[in-house]
């Protein structure tokens, strides 16, 4: 009868390892209380006796089988032994470490100078490393070409437009009659909002339903010119007969609404139609020298300030003469007079070739020597302060005089505006000194440079 592996006697090495393993394990207390009570303890007693009767080799084998760490250590040792087993130990029998040819060189202290003498050696790759997938090297990046990008953008735009046209042809229009009233109203509102938000197009010089709008505008302006001329003649006749002149006042709202229409701007200032001549008839004084109503002056001058009137229009209409009359006459209101001066300056500036930029404006200069006036002033002061008693007596006698036209206090007449600029007499000590106001010019120059840079950035 052959012995089974479980009943074979343990070897001495197994016994030693078993003793070491048992020494490491913690000692379990005998007669430990169990949760099940005495009955469970009595039932487990025979099993413990049977386990103690088993050989030590069986317990050692079970512990080694249950411990995975021991298996891993054993696997590592076996791998190392397999690698070393391939080396031929016979070739190292004649090796003598004392006969190795090593050059005797003096030891050097490593510093910044001789640190660069250490060579660099690249590690040689093995066949296994060569079999690994090499990292794909990034190629050279192409520079951006604006012209090529524009061409590609145009091609893409053409493709998109073709695709969009194809979709439009394929799509079938939805019948709105099948929709409920709320949906139809919502879609109508959306269409109206889209049309309102679209960029406005030029509506001048086009035809709508076979009607030439330009010709229609010219006819309307010509009719208004004739009516305005007739109204001015009727007011002049009524004024001669002593009746109130009301025809121009009745037509004033229609005239102002026509002058404020932006789509008729070119026709309004056209010298051939010459509507501004009728406006001149409304603004000029009547035969008896009386001025037109204040409402006519204010509304028409406000409308004239918005029109681009040029030299040809001024010559054909003659309205500039009426504006000059309002600037020189004393009868118009101050507000009307200022509006007339503003119109005259705006119309004469391109004729006189003057710029509206105040930084480029040229002022008339004149020299002024205050020394003679100062000498007269000091002489008066000396004559007045000859004696304190005389001055006090003079002041007392002046106060006791009866009130007359000569001894009343009046505000002195001074110039409110100046047209001649005094010539500067400041002498610079050094030619490298900065002139007065240079800091303001530098600040303006920097602000202008920032605006130009911002505009260039927005274009990109």
Swiss-Prot record:
Biased composition (Low complexity): 48-60
Feature: compositional bias, Polar residues: 1-16
Biological process according to GO: poly(A)+ mRNA export from nucleus
Biased composition (Basic residues): 133-147
Keyword flag Transcription regulation: yes
Disulfide bridges in this chain: none
Pfam families associated with the record: Med26
Major localisation: nucleus
Acidic residues: bias regions: 64-101
Chain ranges of the TFIIS N-terminal domain: 277-354
Compartment(s): Nucleus
Nucleus found in the keyword field: yes
Positions of region (Disordered): 1-186
Gene Ontology, cellular component aspect: nucleus
PROSITE patterns membership: TFIIS_N
Keywords noted in UniProt: Nucleus, Transcription, Transcription regulation
Task of the protein: Transcription factor involved in RNA polymerase II transcription regulation. May function in both SPT15/TBP post-recruitment and recruitment steps of transcription.
Family that this chain belongs to: Belongs to the IWS1 family.
Stated name of the protein: Transcription factor iws1
Gene source species: Aspergillus fumigatus (strain ATCC MYA-4609 / CBS 101355 / FGSC A1100 / Af293)
The gene coding this protein: iws1
């Amino acid at each position: 009868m052959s012995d089974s592996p479980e009943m074979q006697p343990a070897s001495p090495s197994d016994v030693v390892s078993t003793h070491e393993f048992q020494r490491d394990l913690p000692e379990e207390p005998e007669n430990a209380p169990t949760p099940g009570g005495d009955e469970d303890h009595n039932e487990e007693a025979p099993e413990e006796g049977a386990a103690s009767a088993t050989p030590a080799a069986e317990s050692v084998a079970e512990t080694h089988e249950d411990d995975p760490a021991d298996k891993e250590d054993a696997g590592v040792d076996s791998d190392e032994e397999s690698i070393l087993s391939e080396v031929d130990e016979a070739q190292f029998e004649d090796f003598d470490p004392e006969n190795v040819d090593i050059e005797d060189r003096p030891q050097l202290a490593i510093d910044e100078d001789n640190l660069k003498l250490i060579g660099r050696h690249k590690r040689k790759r093995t066949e296994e490393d060569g079999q690994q997938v090499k990292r794909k090297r990034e190629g050279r990046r192409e520079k951006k070409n604006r012209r090529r990008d524009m061409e590609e953008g145009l091609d893409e735009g053409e493709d998109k437009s073709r695709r969009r046209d194809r979709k439009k042809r394929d799509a079938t229009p939805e019948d709105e009659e099948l929709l409920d009233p709320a949906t139809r109203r919502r879609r109508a509102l959306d269409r109206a909002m889209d049309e309102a938000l679209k960029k406005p197009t030029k509506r001048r010089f086009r035809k709508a339903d076979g009607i030439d709008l330009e010709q229609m505008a010219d006819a309307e302006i010509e009719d208004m010119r004739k009516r305005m001329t007739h109204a001015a003649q009727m007011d002049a006749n009524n004024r001669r007969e002593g009746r109130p002149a009301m025809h121009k006042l009745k037509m004033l709202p229609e005239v102002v609404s026509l002058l404020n229409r932006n789509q008729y701007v070119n026709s309004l200032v056209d010298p051939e139609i010459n509507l501004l001549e009728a406006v001149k008839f409304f603004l000029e004084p009547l035969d008896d020298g009386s001025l037109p109503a204040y409402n006519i002056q204010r509304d028409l001058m406000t409308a004239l300030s918005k029109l681009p009137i040029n030299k040809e229009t001024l010559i054909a209409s003659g309205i500039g003469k009426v504006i000059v009359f309002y600037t020189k006459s004393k009868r118009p209101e101050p507000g009307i007079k200022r509006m007339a001066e503003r119109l005259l300056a705006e119309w004469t500036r391109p004729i006189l070739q003057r710029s509206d930029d105040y930084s480029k404006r040229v002022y008339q200069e004149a020299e002024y020597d205050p020394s003679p006036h100062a000498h007269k002033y000091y002489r008066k002061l000396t004559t007045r302060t000859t004696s304190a008693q005389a001055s006090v007596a003079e002041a007392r006698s002046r106060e006791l005089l009866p009130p007359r036209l000569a001894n009343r206090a009046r505000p002195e007449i001074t110039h409110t505006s100046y047209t001649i600029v005094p010539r500067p007499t400041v002498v610079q000590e050094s030619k490298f000194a900065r002139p007065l106001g240079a800091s303001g010019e530098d600040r303006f120059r920097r602000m202008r440079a920032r605006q130009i840079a911002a505009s260039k950035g927005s274009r990109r």
